[in-house]
A protein has these predicted regions:
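Short, Lys/Arg-enriched N-terminal segments with co-localized hydrophobic residues
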Residues: 1-17, 484
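N-terminal Rossmann-like NAD(P)+-binding subdomain of aldehyde/semialdehyde dehydrogenases
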Residues: 13, 18-127, 155, 297
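Conserved C-terminal structural/oligomerization subdomain of aldehyde/semialdehyde dehydrogenase
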Residues: 20, 49, 53, 348-484
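Rossmann-like NAD(P) dinucleotide-binding subdomain of oxidoreductase/dehydrogenase enzymes
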Residues: 117-258
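ATP/NTP phosphate-donor binding region
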Residues: 485-572
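Carboxylate- and glycine-rich phosphate/diphosphate-binding segment that chelates Mg2+/Mn2+
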Residues: 640-720
Length: 720
């Protein structure tokens, strides 16, 4: 059915003939009568909304299934009605669109939950409940009248939203016929009586009154830019679409016969009325002549210079590069008309079997009106000097008349396809497929099947996807109390007992070691002890010493140490001393491995260490951090904390992140046994303070309580 030719059945159904219309004089309803009509429809819809509240997912799915079958059963009749009433498009192609709306859309909706609890996650504690958005106003265009009615009715029924339609005046009767088919099937399947309604008054005032009615919850606007803008101006949620000016970039690596077939198939479908159809083919110069030969095989007519001017004049009221070309505006009479009719009206003739009229253009933009959206079987052809030029022309075309809509590319180079996608401000990038079918989804790709194509903020739309039932539900969320995970994190390796510093002799992967400490550690001979152990290794290790750490180390000292590290390039950093030396070494480690880190970023406060605004980078890629304490109390050797002073501001900044947790902690009591009594007592008070604070902390746990109580016990057992 997708490959049916445009000639088939035309004579029997009048697919390419302008329907004869006899003017019927009718009394124009007053504004008061129109308002009353709209009020009546909305009140009935609100009642239907109440009735829908008690429906189950199974009932809703049954209704949608029966409506889909009814649409399928009438797809040909509705297509015939649309062609005869509007005088536009092709019968069998409109039949295909009706089939698409019934079959592809319903298949996409089949497993979608839209009623009640749709998701319950015991892990996160989130329960999601789907509710209808309310009464929907559905705007229906003349380009796809019956298929749009079917599509919007199905997604409204799936979500338990009553819908009230405003049909385009030139497609009112065929749209109404489609609405009756779906409504009657829905009611027969158990839906509320007024689940689908429509305005019987054909006027802009009636449409505006409906869109602005306080009982309308949201608007599904498919139509011209003016109608979509009006929908968005109503002060309520609206799902509108923008104009499409779809370029098809034919890149030199493409499979040319397939690309040409796709473009002709897509552009000729329903006489080019789908907004996602190609408006221009931009062809690389390397394959330009081959492209021209190939496309002429498909009943495509290329206009000459004089015919191009006539075509521009008829379609846009201005010739290319003329004085008034900037004011060019599409003649609405050409939309959806066959190529032969367009040529005849423009003042020249083409063969009766012509599928598409092609015109070679020099550039994209106002000077070439045929590079605008045309919604007819007329295609601009442009030559690209290079890949960059082809992408630039495609991007310019989208920005010129179709921001946010769609763009197509035919290529075998996926990197070029990605580059094309980055460059074009189009929501849908269709690769190696007819853009008409690629844009509406589910035929050549996995896009959501839809006849309402959102264009995002590029096209001043509220949705940047193919509109579907997911856009017509409110999702309420129940958030169960779910306490944060608690955790205990220590260095991967903690060594203790007397002379445990011998681990430095046996550990693997040490070639360059930098010791960070203070001058007293040198004077007491502690540094020499560390160096002696390292020299006992089987391999030679280069050792660098930084002993300028002061009490309450400053950021300036840290930067001096970092500079030395960058020159020496250690693979092991050994912090020896009290809290000051270990804190300074941790921050040196951070800045050595990540020169881009800014102190102003890492010093910021936080509420949750796992959710802080600035994320510390992962450490250990260049060097391991080994902390060897020589006093008790701070515990810096096993914690993610470091306190650094900014002397210019005279402030201390506690830095905290699990990235600062040392790689290895060596707690060797040999270093604290020789402390003077007074200093040992001072550090004991430090231990006691930290232990009590840990025990009463709101972050205390069964793991930390044991350590805290044991620390308190040791203080009272061994200090007087």
């Amino acid at each position: 059915i997708w490959l049916c030719t445009n000639e088939k059945f035309h004579n029997s159904y009048g697919g390419n003939k302008m329907a004869e219309k006899k003017p019927v004089q009718q009394a124009v309803p007053t504004e008061a009568e129109t308002d009353a009509h709209v009020d009546d429809l909305v009140n009935k819809a609100l009642k239907a909304l109440e009735e829908f509240e008690d429906f189950t997912q199974e009932q809703v799915d049954y209704i949608v299934a029966k409506c889909s079958v009814a649409g399928l059963d009438h797809h040909g009749i509705l297509a015939e009605a649309a062609v005869k009433e509007t005088g536009r498009g092709v019968f069998e192609d409109k039949a295909v669109k009706n089939l698409f709306a019934c079959e592809y859309v319903t298949n996409n909706l089949r497993h979608l939950k839209t009623v009640g609890i749709i998701n319950e996650d015991p892990l996160t504690g989130i329960t999601e409940i789907a509710e209808p958005v309310g009464v929907v106003c559905g705007i229906v265009p003349t380009t796809n009248p019956t298929s749009t009615v079917i599509f919007k009715s199905l997604i409204a029924l799936k979500t338990r939203n009553p819908i009230i339609f405003s049909f385009h005046p030139s497609a009112h009767e065929s749209s109404k016929q489609a609405a009756i088919v779906i409504r009657d099937a829905a009611i027969a399947a158990g839906a509320p009586e007024n689940c689908i309604q429509w305005l019987s008054i054909k006027s802009m005032y009636a449409t505006n009154a409906l869109m602005n009615h306080p009982g309308i919850a949201t608007i599904l606007a498919t139509g011209g830019n003016a109608m979509v803008k009006a929908a968005y101006s109503c002060g309520k949620p609206a799902l509108g679409v923008g104009a499409g000016n779809v370029p098809a970039y034919v890149e030199k690596t493409c499979v040319l016969p397939r690309a040409v077939n796709d473009i002709v198939l897509s552009k000729s479908f329903d006489n080019g009325m789908i907004c996602a159809s190609e408006q221009a083919a931009i062809v690389d110069q390397e394959i330009y002549s081959d492209f021209m030969k190939e496309i002429k095989r498909f009943h495509v007519y290329f206009v000459n210079k004089e015919e191009k001017a006539k075509l521009e004049k008829f379609m846009f009221g201005a010739e290319a590069y003329s004085e008034n070309v900037a004011q060019a505006k599409l003649n609405p009479n050409v939309v959806g008309k066959p190529a032969e009719w367009i040529a005849e009206q423009a003042g020249f003739k083409v063969p009766a079997e012509t599928q598409i009229i092609c015109a070679e253009c020099k550039e994209v933009g106002p000077n070439e009106p045929l590079t605008r959206e045309k919604l007819s079987p007329v295609l601009a052809i442009l030559k690209a000097k290079s890949t960059d030029d082809g992408i630039a022309k495609a991007a310019a075309m989208v920005e010129f008349n179709g921001l946010g809509h769609s763009a197509a590319i035919h290529t075998e180079d996926h990197e070029i396809s990605k580059k094309f996608g980055h460059a074009c401000k189009a929501i849908r990038i269709i690769e190696n497929a007819p853009s008409t079918f690629g844009g509406i989804g589910s035929v050549y790709n996995a896009f959501i099947p839809s006849l309402t194509l959102g264009c995002g903020s590029y096209g001043h739309n509220s949705v940047s996807n193919n509109v579907s039932a997911v856009n017509l539900i409110n999702i309420k969320r129940i958030g169960r109390r779910n306490n944060n995970m608690q955790w205990v994190k220590l260095p991967p390796k903690v060594y203790f007992e007397k002379n445990s510093i011998r681990y430095l002799r046996d550990m693997k992967h040490m070639e360059k070691a930098m010791i960070v400490t203070d001058r007293s550690m040198v004077n007491l001979g502690y540094v020499e002890k560390i160096e002696d152990v390292i020299r006992r290794r089987r391999n030679h290790v280069d050792i660098e010493l930084f002993f300028d750490v002061e009490p309450d180390p400053s950021i300036d000292t840290v930067r001096e140490g970092v500079e030395l590290m960058r020159k020496f390039e250690p693979d092991c950093i050994i912090a020896l001393g009290g809290g000051s030396s270990m804190d300074a070494a941790k921050v040196m480690w951070l800045m050595y491995e990540n020169p881009e880190v800014n102190f102003d970023d890492i010093k910021q406060k936080f509420m949750d260490i796992r959710k802080r605004a600035f994320k510390f980078p992962e450490l250990g890629k260049k060097a391991k951090m080994i902390c060897i304490p020589t006093t008790s109390g701070t515990g810096s050797e096993v914690t993610p904390f470091a306190v650094i002073t900014d002397k210019k501001e005279n402030k201390k900044y506690p830095l905290t992140d699990y990235a600062l947790t040392p790689t290895i902690a060596i707690v060797d009591p040999e270093f604290v046994m020789s402390l003077p009594g007074a200093i040992a007592a001072d550090t004991g008070i430090d231990v006691l303070t930290h232990a009590v604070e840990a025990y009463v902390s709101i972050l205390a746990s069964d793991f930390t309580d044991g350590w805290a109580k044991q620390a308190v016990k040791l203080v009272f057992d061994y200090l007087e």
